[in-house]
Amino acid sequence: MKRLFFPLLLIIILSCQSNSINKKNPIKEEVSQKKTFLKLEKERYNVAFLIMDGTFNTELTAPFDIFQHTIFRKNIKAMNVFTVANTDQAITTFEGMRIMPDYNYLKDSLPKIDIFVVPSAEHHLNSDLEDIAMIDFVKQVDKEATYVTSHCDGAFVLAKAELLKGKVSTTFPSDINTMRKMFPELDIRKDVLFVHDGKYITSAGGAKSFEAALYLCEFLYGKEVAKSLAGGLVIDWNVDTVPHLVVK
């Protein structure tokens, strides 16, 4: 009987210790998973990119590349670039890239956003426009942002948020008629790659997202800086050769 008792007692003791350790582990895990945020440099423009499942790579990465490279130019007000989404989990782009958002706009305290970028996403012509929280967020950011830009069908989001009323805009060429039918009160132009009207810059998207981003940099920093940024990405840049419209 004693031979059975002591092994049984040992098993019970080890089991209790194991349970005690397991109870402590979730606390350690919770601490280790505490969210950390980017360090944003002062005296820079804060540039937020709105991302979600189905975001198209080029409309995100083209302006992101151009704007991020401003930190390597001297004597200018460079840009802090970061992403915002409605989740803490990775989003999956249309092409399959997985990206962890820097901020969750539903939960986190966001920095002031100076420049807001809305790349196109797969469902910007339908279900995304029914996302009330997202549309409300866009409206809220617009109140303080100095510039708001869209690429490709990102213009549909701006239109749904009622930001393009009284403004001239453009979108992905084959979706212009769709946008005109959906928002008949808007002035939507074709045969241009981007439109600058007030604080809003809307572009045709795709690879031409580079041109719209370079235009904003030229507008903010001048021709030489824009050419330098373009050269760093092996892009021939001359705004005069790009079909565009600036509304004065």
List PLM regions with ranges.
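A conserved active-site-flanking secondary-structure segment within enzyme catalytic domains
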Residues: K165-D191
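Sec-dependent signal peptide recognition
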Residues: K2-L8
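Conserved Rossmann-fold dehydrogenase catalytic segment
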Residues: R189-A204, V234-N238
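A short beta-strand/loop micro-motif in the catalytic core of glycosyltransferases
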Residues: V148-T149, S169
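Extended, subdomain-level signal for the structured scaffold at the beginning of enzyme domains
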Residues: Q17-V148, F156-A159, N177, K190, ...
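C-terminal motif of bacterial Sec signal peptides marking the signal peptidase cleavage site
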Residues: I12-S15
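Residues that mark the start of a beta-strand
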Residues: R44-N46, V168, K199
